[in-house]
Each structure stands twice: as C-alpha cells, then as structure tokens.
C-alpha cells in the first residue's frame, strides 16, 4: 500500500510542478520548436540535402571499382581443330610414309644405292616416333583447359571534361540544401506564430475571466444594495429583477469565459508538447497593461524580399533551373575521361594458357562526341530554359504578393495601435461614468437602470481594451512573419 501511494505521488507531482511553473512567451516558443514533428522532418531533409551535396562533390574525384567473375563452360576453348590435332599427332608417320615412297623410287632408279637406302629405312620408325612426339607436344601445349575461368579487374575512371555537368549538379545540390534550410526557417516561423496566437489567446481569456469575476461581484453588490433599498421602500421589485437578470447573464458569461480559457490552455499545451491537463500559468496573465513599446516599421519592402523564406526558396529554385539548363546542354557536348586499371585472369593469357594468375596494367583516354541527334539536344535545352523562365515568373508574382501582404500587415498593426489608444481613452470615460453613476445611485439621483447601463459600458470598455492589447501583440507577430524575421 505504501509503495502504491508513493508511486501515485510520483505520478501526480510532475503535473503539480507543471501547473505551478510560469511560462514566458519565449519558453513556449522553445518548447513548441523542440517537439514539433514537422520541424524534425524538415531538419532531416536538411541532413539529406547535405549528404546529396557531399555526394555530388565526389564526382570531381577518380572512381575506383573492382570487378570479378567466374565461369564454368561445358567445353574448353580449342585453338586447334580436330583435323589439325590429328595431323600434328601423326606428323612423323605421315612424313616417313612419304619419305619411304621417295626412297623406293630412288632405289629403282639407282640400284647401287640400295644398301644405303636400306640403312636409312631402318631409322624411319624411330624418326617417325620422335616427330610424332614433337607434334603431340605441340597439341598438348595448345591445350587451354579453360572450362574453369576466373577474371578480375581494378578499374579507375577520372572525369576530365563532362560538358559542365558535374559543376552544374554540384550547384543544384548546394541550392537544394539552402532551400531545405529556408523551409525549416519558414516552418519555425509558422510554429512561432501559432504559439503566439495561442499564447495571447490564453492571456486574453485569463484577463476576461478576471473582468467577468469583477463584473459579477459588482452586480452581486448592487443586488444587495437594491434589496436594502427595497426594504427601505426606495426601490421597486422591478429594479431587483433587472439586476437579477444582469447577474444571471454575468454568471453565464463567466462560465463561457472559463470554458474557453480551459480549451485555450489545452490548445497551447498541445502546441508546446505539454500534458493537456497541466494548465500552465503564463507570465502575462496577471498584467493589467499589456501594451508594449511600438515596433518600428520599415519604410520599404526590400527587407521582406531579403528575409522572407518563401522568396528565398523561389530564388534558389530559379538558380536550380538555370543549372538544369547546363545539365541538359552537357549531354550533347564532348565527354572526356581518363581510364586506367589492372586486369588478371586464370588461366593466364599473357604466357600461353598458364595455370596461374597473371595480369596486365592499362591506361587510356575515352572521348565521346555526339554527332547527330535530329535536334534533340536543342529542344531539351529550350525546354529547360522555359522551366527557368516559369520559375522567374513565379518569383516575380510571389514578390508582388509578399509586398501586398507586408503592406496589409503594416496597416493592421497600425490600426491595432490606434484601436488600443481609443480603447484606453474610452475606458477612462467608462470608469469615470461608472464612478459618477455609483455615487449618484447611493444618493438616489441615478436610477438602477442607468447604473446597470454604466456597469455594462464599463465591462464593454474593459473587454475592448483587452482585445485591443491582444490584437497589438498578434498583429506585431504577423508583421514580423510577413517580413520574414519572426523569432530572429
């Protein structure tokens, strides 16, 4: 039982700690950036682009490869035909047979040479055997025994000129890496804007909750005062009913605000990766005045073109399409490469068909020159140029849209500042009106209905001021994002 209680305390304790901790806007931003899965994916895409760039850089270097093979054939390679083998094996026999016929003709023509010819004839068998042996040795020497063949080679290739393809491909991978980095920067700004909106929504509802409580307490006190006036005969039951209706409305408003605040906190927890039931407290929740120093606005839109991630991505895309034009052109330019290597075989090919591994070194140059392709290269290059032109037009259009978006964001930020000043002035008047109405109601010169109206105006003025303050914060974040510098 003690172990169970101890475990339960350990499980509940972190939630209590989270609930007690007060989070600032920067802390919420950092939490959201760390736990966001899409940002993790974009970071991995940067790593992939980096590896692609490094892989492209290796194309400048020589490539070394190893090749090997084994082959078993049903018959060996024969350098001699069967007739040639038979002729060589019986070379002595055939030669002595022809020689015997010639010697018989000599004896017929010159009988006196018969003893000499007879002595030579006795040597014919040994001569025939020796010559047959020599012929058979030639046949045996030309026996390849290549039914089992093994070959291996080490190859080296060094590109010398590829029509600019290697350099263009390196540029493409470099720009692709920069695009991935800009995507991550844009994704971070999107997450930060979501955090800012959720954060200030919680702050807004927390302030409205306090305002709703103050309004309800004000009506409860008024209800008590009216009941006392009724007992004194100064007020009527209708006055009490009016106050009661307003009090019920205030209770309903407070309930809605509290429910909205709970949902807003849960949304902020989801964005920041916190437990949904943690109910974090924010640093600005207790602040009465949320207005900050006005942000200086740029006089031109060039800053947005420089920092906006979307524009930077499109600029790099234009560079990529320009490099692709060179890639297409390089396919129809001469390609020059240095070749070298070492090859070995078994049986050896450099000393007959010797049964051992022997190899040879080799070095050379290869040149490939396209001669005629019916205009294919020209058409492909023009197609690549058209794609590059499309990318430029997309960039120009995006610049115009960004310029419009920045202008709109500036107007909204300026409008929010003006609304805040007006709401503060309106709040001062509403508070003064409420003070006068409360004093007059105590003196009996102001009716309950007029006091309720003054209280409602006070509530609306406070609510508008809270909305104006939050609107200033959010529009500033939106302007920063439009300029491409949110969170930087």
Question: Predicted segment positions?
Answer:
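Small/polar (Gly/Ser/Thr/Ala-rich) solvent-exposed segments
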Residues: 40, 64-78, 137-147, 157-186, ...
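Small/polar, glycine/serine/threonine/aspartate-rich low-complexity segments that form flexible
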Residues: 68-154, 285-293, 339-369
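Amphipathic alpha-helical coiled-coil segments
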Residues: 41-56, 187, 193-210, 221, ...
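Sec-dependent N-terminal signal peptides
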Residues: 4-13
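Periplasmic alpha-helical coiled-coil/stalk elements that build and connect Gram-negative outer-membrane
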Residues: 3, 51-53, 182-303, 412, ...
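Bacterial Sec-pathway N-terminal export signals of envelope proteins
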Residues: 19-78, 234, 276, 283-319, ...
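Transmembrane beta-barrel domains of outer membrane proteins
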Residues: 57, 157, 326-329, 366-368
């Amino acid at each position: 039982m003690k172990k169970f209680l101890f475990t339960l305390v350990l499980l509940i304790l972190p939630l209590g700690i989270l609930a007690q901790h007060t989070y600032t806007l920067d802390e919420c931003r950092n939490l959201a950036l760390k736990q966001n899965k899409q940002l993790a994916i974009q970071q991995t895409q940067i790593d992939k682009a980096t590896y692609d760039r490094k892989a492209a850089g290796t194309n400048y270097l020589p490539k070394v490869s190893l090749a090997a093979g084994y082959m078993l054939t049903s018959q060996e390679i024969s350098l001699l035909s069967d007739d040639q083998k038979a002729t060589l094996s019986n070379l002595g026999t055939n030669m002595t047979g022809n020689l015997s016929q010639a010697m018989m003709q000599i004896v017929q023509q010159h009988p006196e040479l018969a003893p000499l010819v007879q002595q030579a004839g006795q040597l014919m068998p040994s001569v025939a055997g020796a010559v047959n042996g020599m012929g058979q040795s030639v046949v045996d020497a030309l026996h390849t025994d290549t039914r089992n063949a093994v070959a291996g080679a080490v190859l080296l290739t060094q590109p010398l000129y590829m029509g600019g393809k290697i350099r263009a491909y390196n540029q493409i991978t470099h720009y692709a890496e920069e695009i991935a980095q800009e995507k991550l920067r844009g994704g971070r700004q999107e997450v930060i804007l979501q955090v800012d909106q959720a954060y200030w929504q919680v702050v807004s509802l927390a302030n409205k909750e306090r305002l709703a409580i103050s309004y309800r307490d004000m009506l409860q006190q008024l209800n008590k005062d009216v009941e006392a006036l009724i007992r004194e005969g100064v007020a009527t039951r209708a006055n009490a009913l009016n106050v009661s209706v307003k009090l019920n409305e205030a209770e309903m408003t407070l309930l809605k605000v509290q429910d909205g605040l709970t949902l807003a906190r849960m949304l902020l927890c989801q964005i920041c990766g916190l437990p949904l039931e943690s109910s974090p407290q924010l640093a600005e929740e207790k602040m009465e005045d949320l207005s900050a120093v006005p942000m200086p606005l740029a006089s031109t839109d060039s800053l947005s073109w420089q920092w906006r991630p979307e524009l930077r991505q499109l600029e790099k895309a234009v560079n990529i399409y320009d490099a692709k034009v060179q890639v297409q052109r390089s396919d129809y330019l001469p390609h020059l490469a240095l070749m070298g290597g070492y090859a070995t075989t078994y049986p050896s090919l450099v000393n007959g068909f010797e049964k051992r591994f022997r190899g040879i070194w080799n070095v050379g140059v290869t040149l490939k020159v396209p001669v005629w392709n019916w205009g294919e290269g020209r058409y492909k290059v023009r197609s690549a140029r058209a794609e590059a032109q499309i990318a430029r037009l997309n960039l120009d259009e995006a610049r115009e849209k960004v310029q419009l978006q920045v202008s709109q964001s500036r107007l909204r930020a300026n409008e929010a500042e003006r609304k805040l000043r007006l709401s503060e002035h309106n709040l001062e008047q509403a508070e003064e009106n409420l003070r006068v109405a409360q004093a007059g109601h105590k003196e009996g010169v102001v009716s309950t209905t007029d006091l309720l109206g003054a209280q409602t105006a006070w509530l609306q003025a406070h609510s508008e001021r809270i909305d104006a303050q939050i609107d200033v914060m959010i529009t500033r974040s939106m302007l920063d994002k439009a300029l491409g510098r949110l969170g930087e």
